[in-house]
Each structure stands twice: as structure tokens, then as C-alpha cells.
Amino acid sequence: MERAIQGNDAREQAYGERWNGGSGSSTSPFKLPDESPSWTEWRLHNDETISNQDNPLGFKESWGFGKVVFKRYLRYERTETSLHRVLGSWTGDSVNYAASRFLGFDQIGCTYSIRFRGVSVTISGGSRTLQHLSEMAIRSKQELLQLTPVEVESDVSRGCPEGIETFKEESE
């Protein structure tokens, strides 16, 4: 009975934090606070006639442990600096620690999900494979958010990767 009460308290804390956008709580796997756009900001960047369109200001990601789900919306400006910031939104250690609050002797399902530019990736597995699951989630997140050469910050010509001019000179 005591274990069930503790579990319910943890779920209530997770539910409150999920919607209040808090960070740094003892249960959340996320290190950054929720950065969801305001209603006004959302309307400025979206066409109301297209209901399934993502907000171009960032991306959504979530971690689920059994019935408890932690969600975040993070701003992402598609620059190298922004990429490094959002890649640090959680670590394997923070995920393991958060999951340990909900794991018992039985194996439960663990899920990571990310949605960016209309592409959604979900990775799931049992709690006994959590380390492997978080490694796969990190790789998936990096690949999905990977910058194209046009989006890389550069001193040369902002958007043009170094070496382009050299290649053009050689081909002439």
C-alpha cells in the first residue's frame, strides 16, 4: 500500500510539472524548461486552415515511463548554437534517474518521442533496456535535428559552407 501511495504522489508531481513547464524537479528527465509558444505567437506562425501543421519555432519531445509522460516543447532556431543547447535537454543519467522513480520489480514500457517539421520518431522498449533506448533516442534526435549546410553558421557567407568557393575555382 505504501508503495502505491508513493507512486501516485510521483505521478501527480510529474503531471503538474508536465503542464507547468517546470525544470530541475527530482522526477523530470529534462534539464530545460518547457518553451511552448504563447497562443498569440502560435497564431502568428501558423495557418489556421491547416490543423496538423507544426509550429516552426521548435520541436516537441517526450519521455514516458509506464503511464507517466513528461513532455517538452523546445525552441530551435536551426543554428549550431541552438542545436548544441537542445541536444543537452536531457542526458542518459537524467533519464535513468527519472525512470528509477517509476520502476519497480516488474518491467514497464519506456518510450521516447520527438516531432520536428512534421516528422515524428518514437522509440520504445522495456525498462531493462533503458540504457540502449536512451542511446538510440540521442542518435535519433541528432539525426532529426541535423543541420543542412545552408543552416550552418559560418563566417564565410552565412549559409555557405567553407570550400564551396574553392570547388568552383577548380572546376573552371
From Swiss-Prot:
**Signal sequence, renumbered to the chain:** none
Which spans does this entry mark as compositional bias, Basic and acidic residues?
Answer: 1-15
Q: Where is this region: Disordered?
A: 1-37
Taxonomically, which superkingdom? Answer: Viruses
Q: Which InterPro entries match?
A: Tombusvirus_p19 (IPR004905), VP19_sf (IPR036131)
Q: Which UniProt keywords apply?
A: Host-virus interaction, Inhibition of host innate immune response by virus, RNA-binding, Suppressor of RNA silencing, Viral immunoevasion
Q: Quote one Gene Ontology molecular function term.
A: RNA binding
Q: Give any single GO term for biological process.
A: symbiont-mediated suppression of host innate immune response
**GO CC entries:** virion component
According to the record's subunit comment, the protein's assembly and interactions are: Homodimer.
Q: What does the record give as the function of this protein?
A: Viral suppressor of RNA silencing which binds specifically to silencing RNAs (siRNAs). Acts as a molecular caliper to specifically select siRNAs based on the length of the duplex region of the RNA.
Describe the family membership recorded for this protein in Swiss-Prot or TrEMBL: Belongs to the tombusvirus protein p19 family.
Protein's name according to its UniProt entry: RNA silencing suppressor p19
Task: Show the taxonomic lineage.
Answer: Viruses, Riboviria, Orthornavirae, Kitrinoviricota, Tolucaviricetes
